[in-house]
Structure formats: structure tokens, C-alpha cells
């Protein structure tokens, strides 16, 4: 991790839910994504900010 890379604040998980399923999310540090197992979606984290848009989410395999 570089010095200029912004890190996701895990405390945000307490306030965030999946916009599709309205369920809690899991943080995938390696892929920098928030995972909704219920909706089968992964929301990207860009510059430490979660992008909670369904259109931006990746469908999980």
C-alpha cells in the first residue's frame, strides 16, 4: 500500500447497507469492495469511498 493510498474506514460498515437487499455488507480488503451476499453484488471502494450504486456493482460469480 502506498503512502498516498486512501484506506476505507471499517466503521462505515455500521452505517452502510446494500441498496438492493437492504442487508449488511462485508468488507473485502484485498479487492477493495463491499460485498452483499444476499444480493450477490460487490460494490467498489474508490479512494476510500464506497460507491453504493447498483449500476456500479459487480455481480459475484
Swiss-Prot record:
Please, which domain of life does this record's source organism belong to? Bacteria
Give one Pfam family: Trm112p
Q: Choose one Gene Ontology CC annotation of this protein and give it.
A: cytosol
Coiled-coil stretches noted in the UniProt entry, renumbered to this chain? none
Q: Report the family membership.
A: Belongs to the UPF0434 family.
The identity of this protein, by name, is: UPF0434 protein RD1_0037
Q: Which organism is it from?
A: Roseobacter denitrificans (strain ATCC 33942 / OCh 114) (Erythrobacter sp. (strain OCh 114))
Amino acid at each position: 500500500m502506498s503512502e498516498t493510498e486512501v484506506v476505507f474506514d471499517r466503521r462505515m460498515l455500521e452505517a452502510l447497507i446494500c441498496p438492493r437487499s437492504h442487508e449488511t455488507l462485508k468488507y473485502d480488503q484485498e479487492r477493495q469492495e463491499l460485498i452483499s451476499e444476499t444480493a450477490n453484488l460487490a460494490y467498489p471502494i474508490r479512494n476510500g469511498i464506497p460507491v453504493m450504486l447498483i449500476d456500479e456493482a459487480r455481480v459475484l460469480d
